[in-house]
């Protein structure tokens, strides 16, 4: 049996983070949740993940800074931003940092699931 893909979610809204974590677990992923960018970076350093899903607007360390730190540790890890920041400049910045995708809240959970599967097929 194939090993479950490990996903790190970094999201400061505890309700949203919990719902997203449960949804992905329901689809057979091994999911960790961090409540801010600092906690997310610590979890990333301790565990080998297959995908990171990052909010942008968070206390202590925003998602763009976190993504830059993650990229300095692992250039290949797939990153998806999942955020309410919808300005063109934010989307462009996300991709310049190295995002594989950028989804704007509110979003369709099935689309996130399909984007994740697509990333896993390529990697």
Where are these regions (language model features)?
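C-terminal output helix
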Residues: 107-116
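Acidic catalytic/metal-coordinating carboxylates
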Residues: 36-39, 62-65
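The feature encodes the CheY-like receiver
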Residues: 59, 87, 105
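Two-component/phosphorelay signaling modules centered on CheY-like receiver
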Residues: 14-32
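Active-site residues of response regulator receiver
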Residues: 55, 83
């Amino acid at each position: 049996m194939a090993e479950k893909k490990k996903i790190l979610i970094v999201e400061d809204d505890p309700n949203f983070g919990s719902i997203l974590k449960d949804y992905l677990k329901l689809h057979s992923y091994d999911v960790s949740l961090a409540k801010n960018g600092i906690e997310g970076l610590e979890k990333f350093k301790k565990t080998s993940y297959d995908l990171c899903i990052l909010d942008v607007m968070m206390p202590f360390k925003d998602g763009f800074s976190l993504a830059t730190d993650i990229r300095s540790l692992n250039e290949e890890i797939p990153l998806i931003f999942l955020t309410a920041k919808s300005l063109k400049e934010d989307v462009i910045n996300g991709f310049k940092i190295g995002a594989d995708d950028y989804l704007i809240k509110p979003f369709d959970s099935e689309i996130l699931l399909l984007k994740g599967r697509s990333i896993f097929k390529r990697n």
